[in-house]
Amino acid sequence: MSLYRSKVWCVYIVRRDDGQLYTGITSDLSRRLGEHARGVGARCLRGAKRLQLLYCSASAYDHKTAAQMEYHLKRKRGKYFKLRLIKAQPRFLHQYLSADKPLR
């Protein structure tokens, strides 16, 4: 069994000290936030002095599903959608994404 398939994954959003939002996925949130704090991983977070966790979905997704939702948030949605998501704090991100139809 693949490492990706043997774990459950979540989608999270953090804010840098300059206000920039970062969206990512992980199977271990505390480990991943520690990596970000040490400057390991995402390049855009390496210079940040302080990170604030704003949102974390339920750890209920396989790697593929979590990666698809991360892609959707990063590429298909804007900052204001993410801010609404953070305010709403839905436990299950897939339901929130499917309920909010994109504008055409």
Curated annotation (Swiss-Prot):
UniProt superkingdom: Viruses
Pfam families found in the cross-reference section: GIY-YIG
Family according to the record: Belongs to the UPF0213 family.
Stretches assigned to the GIY-YIG domain: 7-83
TM region(s), chain numbering: none
Organism from which the protein derives: Orgyia pseudotsugata multicapsid polyhedrosis virus (OpMNPV)
PANTHER family documented for this protein: UPF0213 PROTEIN YHBQ
Listed SUPFAM superfamilies: GIY-YIG endonuclease (SSF82771)
InterPro entries from the UniProt entry: GIY-YIG_endonuc, GIY-YIG_endonuc_sf, UPF0213_domain
Listed name of the protein: UPF0213 protein ORF82
